[in-house]
């Protein structure tokens, strides 16, 4: 993949360890920055400016914000997508869908996921615009594929091999 990927992973790990020693609220701080950034994204889009403005609202230094989101806006957008996946999974698990067929479960899961997207339409639209850029397309595809995989796993899919891939690709084309 990328030449700097091992360094990026190592520096993020070192920061998480050192930040955890300083504060046990690493994820809470990331969430605070993210939630503040949602309101800013509507006007400025997903950018480093948005990240730093959200950090300053929460009285977090730019240096620490950059350590939490090393690649700036793209890591913030990835966090946004993963955060909404967590919310989706929590809501979907509350629904009793044992008696439903796989297709009805998929339909219900997509409806739940789209309900979450609608709450922050503009942020979602701007994230899709960012992932349309050639150098971020692979990351966007990975996030969509990850969401589709989470949906199938949550439904209880146990397929392997070719079926595993085709189910996720078909769902990704719908999503």
Stretch-by-stretch model annotation:
Residues 135-157, 168-175:
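Amphipathic alpha-helical packing segments from all-alpha helical-bundle domains
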Residues 54, 58, 103-104, 144:
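Preference for well-ordered, secondary-structure-rich cores of eukaryotic proteins
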Residues 27, 92-126:
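Hydrophobic alpha-helical connector segments
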Residues 26-53, 57-62, 71-78, 82:
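Short, amphipathic alpha-helix enriched in basic
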Residues 83-92:
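Conserved phosphoryl-transfer catalytic core
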Residues 112-147:
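Internal, conserved structured core segments that host functional sites
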Residues 6-21:
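Short, Lys/Arg-enriched N-terminal segments with co-localized hydrophobic residues
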């Amino acid at each position: 993949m990328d030449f700097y990927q091992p360094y990026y992973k190592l520096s993020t790990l070192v920061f998480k360890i050192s930040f955890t020693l300083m504060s046990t609220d690493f994820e809470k701080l990331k969430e605070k920055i993210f939630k503040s950034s949602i309101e800013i994204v509507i006007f400025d889009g997903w950018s480093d400016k948005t990240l730093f403005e959200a950090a300053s609202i929460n009285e977090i230094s730019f240096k620490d914000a950059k350590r939490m989101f090393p690649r700036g806006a793209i890591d913030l957008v990835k966090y946004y997508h993963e955060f909404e996946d967590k919310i989706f999974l929590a809501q979907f698990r509350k629904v009793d869908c044992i008696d439903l067929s796989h297709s009805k479960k998929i339909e219900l899961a997509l409806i739940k996921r789209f309900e979450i997207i609608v709450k922050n339409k503009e942020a979602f639209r701007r994230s899709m615009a960012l992932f349309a850029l050639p150098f971020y397309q692979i990351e966007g595809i990975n996030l969509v594929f990850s969401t589709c995989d989470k949906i199938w796993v949550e439904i209880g899919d146990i397929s392997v091999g070719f079926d595993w891939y085709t189910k996720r690709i078909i769902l990704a084309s719908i999503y």
